[in-house]
């Protein structure tokens, strides 16, 4: 039973850690592309900003789901 709980704790930690890492990389790339597009065509900044925030929310939603599942694994399944 102890080994099973340890594996579940490690799985939950990996889900949260890798989810945060993936979101950070994704938002960093997205922000870089936004700045690149804004520098090339400044007149499109309002449209680009709207699209940037929509896509940033979608990129950030997947890690939040992973964090929710990790909390479930840590507190409901392993606890």
UniProtKB/Swiss-Prot annotation:
Alphabetic keyword roster: ATP synthesis, Cell inner membrane, Cell membrane, CF(0), Hydrogen ion transport, Ion transport, Lipid-binding, Membrane, Transmembrane, Transmembrane helix, Transport
Subcellular localization: Cell inner membrane
UniProt cross-references to InterPro entries, sorted A to Z: ATP_synth_csu_bac/chlpt, ATP_synth_F0_csu, ATP_synth_F0_csu_DDCD_BS, ATP_synth_F0_csu_sf, ATPase_proteolipid_c-like_dom, F/V-ATP_Csub_sf
PROSITE patterns per the UniProt record, alphabetical: ATPASE_C (PS00605)
Family: Belongs to the ATPase C chain family.
Function description: F(1)F(0) ATP synthase produces ATP from ADP in the presence of a proton or sodium gradient. F-type ATPases consist of two structural domains, F(1) containing the extramembraneous catalytic core and F(0) containing the membrane proton channel, linked together by a central stalk and a peripheral stalk. During catalysis, ATP synthesis in the catalytic domain of F(1) is coupled via a rotary mechanism of the central stalk subunits to proton translocation.
Protein name: ATP synthase subunit c
């Amino acid at each position: 039973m102890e080994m099973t709980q340890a594996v579940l704790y490690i799985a939950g930690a990996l889900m949260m850690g890798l989810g945060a890492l993936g979101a950070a990389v994704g938002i960093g790339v997205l922000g870089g592309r936004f700045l690149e597009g804004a520098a090339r065509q400044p007149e499109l900044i309002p449209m680009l900003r709207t699209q940037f925030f929509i896509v940033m929310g979608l990129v950030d939603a997947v890690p939040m789901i992973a964090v929710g599942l990790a909390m479930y694994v840590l507190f409901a399944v392993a606890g």
